Amino acid sequence: MKENKIIVAGIGPGSPEDITPAVVNALKESDVVIGYKYYFQFITSWLSEQTECIDTGMKREKARAELAFEYAEQGKTVCVISSGDAGIYGMAPLIYEMKRERGSEVEILVLPGISAFQKAASLLGAPIGHDFCIISLSDLMTSWEIIEKRITAAATADFVTAVYNPK
């Protein structure tokens, strides 16, 4: 029997081979899959004909999260897909924030995925075998002043640094 839950799944860095078995199982069990339209090309082989797919454009994260709660609160199992890992610049933080704001009883399950920085590191050798950091250059949710401080701190500490969202 299906239950009202949201599965937030990281689908990896852009290749079906990088999607974890746990995410594949979640896709198969979901009534509804919600995500950025580009991501569906990587997952369609695991979806049944009955699965409702809702694709949205970029910068529609809040709308995707709201839709997920609307469907889950109707008793559906909903899978919200993110590229890479859903907890690293993905949908998981927003889903948890919205759960708190709504006072929702919907169960949340986060399934990690392989991040772009992990995939890139594997192709380069082993540059993140010790301490490292990840910094996003996106100023949509963080001021540029804070981003600059983080860049300076990472450089001062001599961290290997993965940079997301360069403009």
Language model features: what each stretch is:
Residues L109-S115:
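Active-site nucleophile and cofactor-binding loops and adjacent substrate-binding regions
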Residues M1-I108, K119:
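Class I S-adenosyl-L-methionine
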Residues G35, I54-D55, V110, C133-S136, ...:
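Structural signal for conserved beta-strand scaffold positions within catalytic alpha/beta enzyme cores
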Residues K2-V8, S115-K167:
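Beta-strand/loop-alpha-helix module characteristic of Rossmann-like adenine-cofactor folds
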